[in-house]
A protein has these predicted regions:
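Structural recognition of the beta-strand scaffold that forms the well-ordered cores
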Residues: 166-171, 175-177
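Extracellular and organelle-lumenal recognition/adhesion modules and their flexible linkers in secreted
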Residues: 1-165, 181-185
C-alpha cells in the first residue's frame, strides 16, 4: 500500500530511472485505498518504483500486487511488471495495452539473500510508453528451511603436506607486477 507519504513520496519507496523520460507520481485513488503509484512516459522509458525488503535466506516467498495500465506500448521493453532486482527469472508476467486492475504474482526462493529490492517496473530491459499504476504490493513468507550449520575438525589428523611449490607461483609474480615486489601475508 502507498498510503503513507514522506516528502511527497511513498514511505520506503523511491523512483529509479534506467532510461530517461519517466514521470513518477503518487496518484488517487488507489485500488483499495486513497493512493497508488504511477509511472508514465510519452517518449518511452525504463523505470521503477523500488523498495528494499528484508527476507529470510533459503525461504520461499510470494510477491503479489495489482497493476492497471493505459496504452502501454513496447519499444524494446517487456511491459509493466513486478520483479526482484538483479535476480534473473524473478519477475511476474508483463502487462501491455490497456488493463483494469489486474493481480499478478511471483513465487520465488530467496536463496542466500537476506534483503532484496522489489521493483514496480515500467519497461523491463527496454523502453515502453503509456501509463501504469501499482497498488497493494505484498511480500508473503510461505516457507523456509531451518539452517543448522556445522563443521567437523579433525585436529589430530595429518593430511597432505604443503607443497614447496605453493609459493613462487603466479600470484607472487602478479604481486611483483602490481605492488612492486611488496608481498604481505
Amino acid at each position: 500500500s502507498f498510503e503513507e507519504l514522506k516528502d511527497g513520496k511513498p514511505l520506503g519507496w523511491r523512483p529509479r530511472t534506467y532510461q530517461p523520460q519517466a514521470v513518477f507520481e503518487v496518484d488517487s485513488p488507489g485500488r483499495s485505498g486513497e493512493r497508488s503509484v504511477k509511472i508514465s512516459s510519452t517518449g518511452g522509458a525504463d523505470a521503477s518504483w523500488s523498495t528494499i525488503v528484508k527476507v529470510k535466506p533459503y525461504s520461499r516467498y510470494r510477491l503479489s500486487g495489482w497493476i492497471k495500465t493505459r496504452d502501454i506500448k513496447s519499444a524494446g521493453g517487456k511491459g509493466v511488471l513486478l520483479n526482484i532486482h538483479q535476480q534473473p527469472g524473478m519477475e511476474t508476467r508483463a502487462l501491455t495495452g490497456t488493463n483494469d486492475w489486474t493481480r499478478i504474482e511471483l513465487i520465488f526462493d530467496s536463496g542466500l539473500n537476506d534483503a532484496l529490492q522489489i521493483n514496480c517496473l515500467f519497461g523491463g530491459w527496454g523502453k515502453v510508453s503509456g501509463e501504469a499504476w501499482f497498488d497493494d504490493i505484498q511480500l508473503e513468507y510461505i516457507s523456509g528451511r531451518a539452517l543448522k550449520p556445522q563443521a567437523t575438525i579433525y585436529a589430530n589428523q595429518n593430511l597432505a603436506p604443503v607443497s614447496k611449490y605453493i609459493y613462487g607461483q603466479f600470484i607472487e609474480h602478479l604481486g611483483r607486477c602490481i605492488y612492486q615486489g611488496l608481498w604481505a601475508e
